[in-house]
Structures are given as C-alpha cells and as structure tokens.
Amino acid sequence: MQKQNWLITGVSTGLGRAFAEAALTAGHTVVGTVRSEEDLRAFEELRPGNAHGRLLDVTDDDAVPGVVAEVEQSVGPLDVVVANAGYGLEGTFEETPLAEVRRQFEVNVFGAVATLRAALPHMRRRRRGHLMAVTSMGGLMAVPGMSAYCGSKFALEGILEALGKEVAQFGIHVTAIEPGSFAPTGPDGP
C-alpha cells in the first residue's frame, strides 16, 4: 500500500485513537486533532515524525478550514479525512435540555460537516481522496433514551449518502463508519 496522509479528528481516546494507531502502524502519516496540549503531546509521542497533533475544536467554524489548509501546506495533500470527533448523549427526549440537544448536533453533525467541507475542495482539485465520518449503529436504528444522539447520527448518515453521490464524479469516495458498541479507552475505559 502506498503511504498516505490522514487527518483524523478527535484522536485523544476511543475510536479516533484506534483509527490513528492503525493508520500509523500501516506506515501512514496521521494528523490528529485534539483539544488540549497534553493530548497533543501524547498523540505525537505515538510515532514521532509520523504523528502530528493539531489543537482543534470542530465546532469552531472559523478554525476548521484553517487547520485543514495548514495541514495541506505543512504535511502534504490529504488522502484520507476521518471526521471522528463526537460523543454520545444519553437522556430521554422529554427530559434532555434543548441546549444539550443543540450541542450534540453541533459536535456530531456540524463538526463533521465542517471538517469534510474544508477538505473537499483540496480533494476535488486533485480528483481523488476519501472522506469518512463516524456515524453509529445509532444512525441506523433508534435507541430509547438516546434520541438526540440517534438523531445526530441519522442526520450524518443522510448527509454522507448524498455527499457520496455528489463527489463520486471527482474520484472522491465517501464512507460512513457505523460501529456498534466498543470498549472506550482513556479515563472512562480500559
């Protein structure tokens, strides 16, 4: 396999960290986004020279395009972008405050959209690339007590399906990653 440049959001723990470790092990260069200096240093220590950390809050609409453009300049053309940053919100529909529902969509939907949109023009110009986003089995079937989370993942599924049809003509692939349950890493898991 040819060495590729990857950008993965949310690599501090969990799936993002696992994706990054797998790509690094395969010999790829990975730029991983985190929200703290401590997590940035820990990520870069995984594979010095191939693991590059960037501070980014995916809900900062102004910051996302700048980070993607900077990575394209400093690391090289991005071959794969994985919009992974997200979280699960538990709570019944009736009892979950609207502000928490909005935040769930800001991170899980609009953060992913901002990330993929920022990378798309670069890939379209090169007529190649792979855009991925982590949805969930919760984006395919509803789970009681997680209406906001499932709603955000259903929304992302629809966006990705349409996006795939829009960009296929440019040689760009789109993948929805739909994991089921997994054991978290970091402070909340093994």
Locations of the language-model features?
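The beta1-alpha1 cofactor-binding region of Rossmann-like NAD(H)/NADP(H)-dependent oxidoreductases
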Residues: 56-66, 98
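Active-site helix of classical SDR
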Residues: 116, 152
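Active-site loop immediately N-terminal to the catalytic Tyr-X3-Lys motif
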Residues: 94, 141-147
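Conserved glycine-rich cofactor-binding loop
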Residues: 12-13
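Substrate-binding pocket helix/loop in short-chain dehydrogenase/reductase
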Residues: 92-93, 100-102
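SDR active-site lid
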Residues: 168-190
